[in-house]
Amino acid sequence: MPNYFFIQSQDPYTDRVTDDQFLLMSQLAGEGKEVSLFLTQNGVVPAAFQAESPMFDKLLDQKIKIYADKFSLEQREIAETELKRNIESAEIHVVVQAMLAGDKVIWN
């Protein structure tokens, strides 16, 4: 069974495609597939505690590993302590590791 590794660089407030991506992640996780999500660039915006994004927030209750790019957080002045639950700050090497492990990598 393949693992899925999504890279989200867009925020759900300016790019409606992100909700479709979040729905796909939710469906795959619901089917028992291993799903990870790496938020980068503007994709880190819904990870902030005060941000409202219903489709993104649903992912927090599923078995999905969610990472937020440290550099992108710093650029947007989002402290690691301001992240929503179940989100881990990480560096780009997690993407490289997923690729080397043979995960199906999907970038938006």
Describe each model-derived feature in a short phrase.
Residues Y4-D19, Q41-A48:
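Short, glycine-rich nucleotide/cofactor-binding loops
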Residues A29, L60, M99-L100:
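Anion (oxyanion) recognition and catalysis
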Residues T40-V44, K70-L73:
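Short beta-alpha junction loops
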Residues N3, G30-S36, K65:
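Residues at the starts of beta-strands that form the adenosine-phosphate
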Residues R76-N108:
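C-terminal structural segments of small proteins and small subunits
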Residues E52-A79:
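A glycine-rich helix N-cap at a beta->alpha junction
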Residues V17-G32:
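Histidine-anchored nucleotide/phosphate-binding helix
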Residues D19-L23, Q50-M55:
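Charged helix-capping and loop-helix junction motifs
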